[in-house]
């Protein structure tokens, strides 16, 4: 539930996302939001309904709240594909709306995909987009240990900066003993691709 308050803390309205393929909201992840043009974009994580393999998997969850009437649209809660920004498991979610009004998200994935996933909508939320890996971690699909922490997303006039730390060992990392190096990556707005990331 998203609750709208006045600046003097009067409760004005609310929006509720029901069902949404969710058994546990915010499971094993974070929460981020961004506001632009009367829209509140929300990205978090959730544990999903039992799948055909008998398990409840975790993934990213995103939706848009229209602040004027508190309606919800563009809820992305189902198992999907990279063109929708889907990440599973998604252990951290960061998001911004860029100067051109495009939604940009950064997730820490361990399976689909396994790495720091940068996603940009082709326009406002709800439209398809492009997903690329800023960094990838060795290990089997879904191995929770990645040896990484994905912690920063910012926009420049010409691109996007992403920050993460990484042991370099992927699933073989010893999280309490291994040294983590800190990385800052740049992805060009005009070449939003693997080759446009350095």
Where are these regions (language model features)?
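Extracellular, repeat-based ectodomains that mediate carbohydrate processing or recognition
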Residues: 1-198
